[in-house]
From Swiss-Prot:
Protein purpose: High-affinity nickel intake protein. Imports nickel ions in an energy-dependent fashion. Necessary for the expression of catalytically active urease.
Predominant cellular place of this UniProt entry's protein: membrane
UniProt protein name: High-affinity nickel-transport protein NixA
Keywords for this protein: Cell inner membrane, Cell membrane, Membrane, Nickel, Transmembrane, Transmembrane helix, Transport
Subcellular location(s) of the protein: Cell inner membrane
Biological-process GO terms, alphabetical: nickel cation import across plasma membrane
Periplasmic topological domain: 27-33, 88-113, 200-225, 274-302
Transmembrane region(s): 6-26, 34-54, 67-87, 114-135, 179-199, 226-246, 253-273, 303-322
Source organism (scientific name): Helicobacter pylori (strain ATCC 700392 / 26695)
Lineage: Bacteria, Pseudomonadati, Campylobacterota, Epsilonproteobacteria, Campylobacterales
Topological type in the membrane: Multi-pass membrane protein
Amino acid sequence: MKLWFPYFLAIVFLHALGLALLFMANNASFYAAASMAYMLGAKHAFDADHIACIDNTIRKLTQQGKNAYGVGFYFSMGHSSVVILMTIISAFAIAWAKEHTPMLEEIGGVVGTLVSGLFLLIIGLLNAIILLDLLKIFKKSHSNESLSQQQNEEIERLLTSRGLLNRFFKPLFNFVSKSWHIYPIGFLFGLGFDTASEIALLALSSSAIKVSMVGMLSLPILFAAGMSLFDTLDGAFMLKAYDWAFKTPLRKIYYNISITALSVFIALFIGLIELFQVVSEKLHLKFENRLLRALQSLEFTDLGYYLVGLFVIAFLGSFFLWKIKFSKLES
């Protein structure tokens, strides 16, 4: 617990600072924008690339016998730094943004959702291919007490291939030997299209409500608070899971099959819903089916809570399934 304390103390400080700046703004109508900023930050912790990056780094450091407790925190700080810097810069361009807000909302909203949806579908399909390969290795290893060297190398190759940005920045992970080394990689992840669109949204929200600079600064701080909390919890969860998973080679591959399968489901599910909502809105489609109507009006800010629960349920489910069905393979 002592090893986690500095990171969670920093997270508490971010929450306190964000709330203090928010209340100093003294504008009740600004609270909705602040809540949105916090949820946008929390949402990022469940992105396929965030999960893959933190997971791969923790696995790498754990295998090397090094401290991996701060991976999730430093990654989120790198990503959040982009948001904080760009929000401050955006404050000086508010006049231009106000003038072009109608155009940005019309074009940016549609294009942003389409790009995000297609991006998630591509990620989901790529990870689905990796999942199938992992399942093949798992089936082959049923009769063995341990995985062969070739199988271990193939597993490592597959696991480090998850996530699109993760693939692009893969060479940089060779330089990560301490938790804080992930900070610049998190910064590079923060330069993505979705983060840029969210920065614009935060800046425009501040401008529309005519909040002070102090109030505007509360948004990226709350964004960082939400992201750092869930990224750090993700890291803690992954570290605990790997402590269990690395005790035997079969547990290791079984655990990664469970996590990869869940990542595939989330990416495809969210990607399809985003595309469905854009198409149905632009074509003015009306549905009688209750499920389709629910999907059409689904709020993604609420989805983050469901994903947290889904990850916990999936891990517990896979753990008990292992105990019931596969633990005999270790004997």
